[in-house]
Every structure is written in structure tokens, then in C-alpha cells.
Amino acid sequence: VLKARDFSADDFARSHPGGALGRRLLVYARDVMHTGDALPLVTHTTSLLDALAEMSAKRLGMIGIIDDDGLLCGIYTDGDLRRSLNQGVDVNRCEVGSVMVQKPHTIPATTLAAEVVELMQRHSINGVFVVDADGRPAGALNALDLIRAGVF
């Protein structure tokens, strides 16, 4: 019937934006990402203990690490903390830059939320930072944000 009426999945999504297909094709990272003061960000020279406090306060399960130019240069997650503790890292004497994951997966704000789900599943990650064209953090989102949006 869709073919006979020349009605595409995109047309259906626009006609039914609240439905599952509509959410998959019409919700973008920019629609669900945390921005501004809600972004968990520290510099690479921040102590791991202070970085953990910021990560806990922002409640995304991750923290972005920026360099001196404000570019995202790394990420540190709840899982990274567990691995650090297992390796005997002293959170009181360590800078987050020495234990961060360099070159994290990032996305532009125009990425469809459904594509973010695929990226997260493919790389077994729970969150991702949104960056602008220059590589500066513009937002962040995690799996719970996608579930709340009805995309996951």
C-alpha cells in the first residue's frame, strides 16, 4: 500500500511523530543531549578525585576531558574508574589526563538518535559526547536519555 501511494517511511514518521518509527526518524542528538552547566567537563590536569566529583554531580556516568584549547581530548567513565581501581590507581594522586580514554567516539548534534543507539551498541559504550565542527564539546547523552526519548 505504501508503494502504491508513493508513501515512504519518512512520510509515515512525519505523519506519526509520536510513534516508534517517528521517534527513530525524527529525534536527533540535539533533542536529547545535556548542554551548558549540565555538561560534565574538566581539564586534563584536573585531579582524578575532582573529576570524579564532577562526574557524580552531573550524573551521566562519564566526564569529558578538554585540552588547553577547549577541545575534547578524552573521556573517563564509570567503567574506567572500576578498571583504574583494579589496577591500583591512587585517585588522590592522579590527574585525569593520565587515565582518560583518548580519542573518544563523538557525534555531531545532527546525528539521528537511532544512529546514536547503533553507535553505542556497536562499540559497547553507554554514553557519547556531542562536539561542534571544531571538536569542542556541545553536549552529551547516555543510554538513559535515549530510553527516555523512546528511541532505545
Language-model features, listed with the residues they occupy:
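Generic secondary-structure signature for well-ordered alpha-helical cores
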Residues: V1-F7, P17, A57, N86, ...
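Internal, active-site/partner-interface "lid" segment
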Residues: K3-H34
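Bateman (tandem CBS) regulatory domains
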Residues: L25-L39, R93-P104
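Short hydrophobic beta-strand segments in globular cytosolic domains
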Residues: L39, L72-C73, R82, V131, ...
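The conserved cystathionine-beta-synthase
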Residues: V42-R59, I66, L85, T106-I125, ...
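Internal helical hairpin/lid segments
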Residues: S56-G79
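Short hydrophobic beta-strand motif reused across regulatory alpha/beta modules
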Residues: G74-T77, A138-N142, L146
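Short alpha-helical segments enriched in small residues
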Residues: R83, G88-Q102, A109-A114
